[in-house]
Amino acid sequence: MKMAIPNKGRLKDPVVQFLASVGVKGNFSDDRALIIPTNWEGVQLVMVRTEDIPSIVESGAAELGITGHDYVIESNSDVDELIRLDFGKSKIVLAVPVSWNIDRVEEIKDEIRIATKYYNIAKQYLEKKNIKAKIVKISGAAEVMPSLGAADAIIDVMSTGTTLKLHGLKPLDTILESSAVVIANRNWVKSEEADKINLLLTMMKGALMARNKKMIFMNVPDDKLDKVIASLPAMLSPTLSKLAKSDAWEVITVVDEDLIPEVIAKVKANGARDIVVVNIEKVVK
């Protein structure tokens, strides 16, 4: 089974790190290799341009792929988006020079030139907004085009807005919100690799569910149990186990990482002791 992943760019490292958290580790010893073996038997990583991944998966050259949602939309590829990931978040925006004294798209009256690598997204957006524009298709950095005089405005990806600001631009409208996504060929369910793909998807979902969660173990005296349980948030309910030769219980629960200090303070005040907090690798439902 082949999975297409980015060979460079802002998604490459997060994708490799995510797959490692899932348990899929590639052998990247040869920087020139385009097909990378992994520790999963029969699973290979195909290193390609992020924007090419949707068409590669659509063609069946790879059963799975991880790319940006924006590239799936731009390519019009007929693929299944199976999982939206929690990284690679960005927006496709219409950005104009800060010197333009406008705050809304509707204030653009004259025909303008717009530089973008998102030709299809731009075309649909401009038609929808009834903006008269000539699209200047590029493959490199769009934000420099207005200062070069090659365009009046741009449609491009924005993460924080810092790069736009550095080039004297401001976002005027958000066209599309994007993040990394796991995509599959439409026929993946019928393929010989369906079982392997299903297992991989299960592990991916498990790794995502475990993000920013911690497991807490604590010992609670019998007479304090109800009070401690009442103070606990939980995915369902805490797990209880009677301690041998003791009038106490072991209580186990899963908590969002941000809530850890608050939870520890509450359960300790209510009588819990021997509190242990551990990382969670995966949560498989």
Curated annotation (Swiss-Prot):
Documented EC number(s): 2.4.2.17
Notes on how activity is controlled: Feedback inhibited by histidine.
GO cellular component terms, semicolon-separated: cytoplasm
Broad EC category: transferase
Cofactor field: Mg(2+)
InterPro entries: ATP-PRT_HisG_long, ATP_PRibTrfase_cat, ATP_PRibTrfase_CS, ATP_PRibTrfase_HisG, HisG_C, N-reg_PII-like_a/b, N-reg_PII/ATP_PRibTrfase_C
Broad class of where this protein is predominantly found: cytoplasm
Keywords: Amino-acid biosynthesis, ATP-binding, Cytoplasm, Glycosyltransferase, Histidine biosynthesis, Magnesium, Metal-binding, Nucleotide-binding, Transferase
Superkingdom, taxonomy of origin: Archaea
Membrane-crossing segments per the record: none
Reaction(s) catalysed by this chain's protein: 1-(5-phospho-beta-D-ribosyl)-ATP + diphosphate = 5-phospho-alpha-D-ribose 1-diphosphate + ATP
One Gene Ontology molecular-function label: ATP phosphoribosyltransferase activity
Key word Protein transport present: no
HAMAP family referenced in this protein's UniProt entry, alphabetically: HisG_Long
Name recorded for this polypeptide: ATP phosphoribosyltransferase
Gene designation: hisG
